[in-house]
Amino acid sequence: MNTSYSQSNLRHNQILIWLCILSFFSVLNEMVLNVSLPDIANDFNKPPASTNWVNTAFMLTFSIGTAVYGKLSDQLGIKRLLLFGIIINCFGSVIGFVGHSFFSLLIMARFIQGAGAAAFPALVMVVVARYIPKENRGKAFGLIGSIVAMGEGVGPAIGGMIAHYIHWSYLLLIPMITIITVPFLMKLLKKEVRIKGHFDIKGIILMSVGIVFFMLFTTSYSISFLIVSVLSFLIFVKHIRKVTDPFVDPGLGKNIPFMIGVLCGGIIFGTVAGFVSMVPYMMKDVHQLSTAEIGSVIIFPGTMSVIIFGYIGGILVDRRGPLYVLNIGVTFLSVSFLTASFLLETTSWFMTIIIVFVLGGLLFTKTVISTIVSSSLKQQEAGAGMSLLNFTSFLSEGTGIAIVGGLLSIPLLDQRLLPMEVDQSTYLYSNLLLLFSGIIVISWLVTLNVYKHSQRDF
């Protein structure tokens, strides 16, 4: 019996190791190209509005894909979907590397990479829930969370070094490493019984069209894109009210505290994602830093600090309550943006400190938004509601990156608004940092107002 237990325990540990590898490279794929955006812009002679689509394209299919894979896991099985995700991710890597001289091929490759990488976060949690014993799941989730945090931390550093000393196109090949997990996962994961069920393909297509055209509007400001987006969403809303198993539960729309929490959380997450995508442009223009310096010196310390803030945030939520932690997180965010807008021209190390507090504030806010939103859901709404929150979180990051890319390309914002004598290179970034601070404060006030008038005690 001890031998059987040891073999089972060994199998669970092996599964966990390969899941950690997939989780690490999923996050790395998202973060690694961020520091290279200015280099890509120079190579293709493109404005930030276009260049930021390198990340937006990935986040778009990544966010939609996480929801799709989660829905399909029971119908098609985890093994099939993981294999499909890995192959698609690697296929996108090859296309991107081979066609990196063509901007349209690069964007297409990032769409494909996102569609493949989405399988990892969506299915890893399902695998842990199904294969890891209940008494070890907490440790498993904690380990995966730490690996994800490490991926977020080292991603900019790795990206900066490779882009500076070799070429940014080689970053596209990094996800190819995930292919080594295939034979092991196929052997370790059991054969699953497929469950028949309905899949709302029409709903996914309508929502995807609406999202894509809205993002195109945020970077080109073409009214025709906005019209197509609005029409797609209207048809989507009408559609999900008719079908029996819709992609998004329309009943959640009646839960006002939940919807406001998701919306305000999405705005905050998107604002921070947009800020992080702006940092490489800002450091290049204002402080003339290299790509390696931006990744290793400026962004790396901030991304690694999230491990500490995550631990502290969890303790504070339990001891002082979610709204207390939300106030701290929003204060970190708004004050950091406001301070940076006035002191942007100081030493580049100052931005490292700002990023530490921005990402720390984001982590506090994420923890609280999840707590508050889940508390506003009835028991039968919990699964669909939290899935929608995760989907919105990923999607808002891609949207934030797209919107900030569009704002960086507007000449009207490149004017001096602050009553200070500063270099002209700081005008655009200082104005956007002021805007970010205002958005954070407004989202915070709306969230507080809604939950203070709700019937639940948070």
UniProtKB/Swiss-Prot annotation:
Q: What is its main location?
A: membrane
InterPro entries cross-referenced by the UniProt entry: MFS, MFS_dom, MFS_trans_sf
According to Swiss-Prot or TrEMBL, what is its membrane topology?
Multi-pass membrane protein
Which PROSITE patterns does the UniProt entry name for this protein?
A: MFS
* Gene Ontology molecular function: antiporter activity
- Which residue ranges traverse the bilayer? 12-33, 81-100, 111-129, 140-162, 165-185, 201-221, 223-240, 256-276, 297-317, 324-344, 346-365, 432-451
Q: Where in the cell is it found?
A: Cell membrane
Q: Which GO terms describe its biological process?
A: proton transmembrane transport; response to antibiotic
Top-rank lineage group of the source organism? Bacteria
Question: What's any one GO cellular component for it?
Answer: plasma membrane
Swiss-Prot/TrEMBL keywords: Antibiotic resistance, Antiport, Cell membrane, Hydrogen ion transport, Ion transport, Membrane, Plasmid, Transmembrane, Transmembrane helix, Transport
Protein family per UniProt: Belongs to the major facilitator superfamily. TCR/Tet family.
Name the job this protein performs.
Resistance to tetracycline by an active tetracycline efflux. This is an energy-dependent process that decreases the accumulation of the antibiotic in whole cells. This protein functions as a metal-tetracycline/H(+) antiporter.
Designated name of the protein: Tetracycline resistance protein
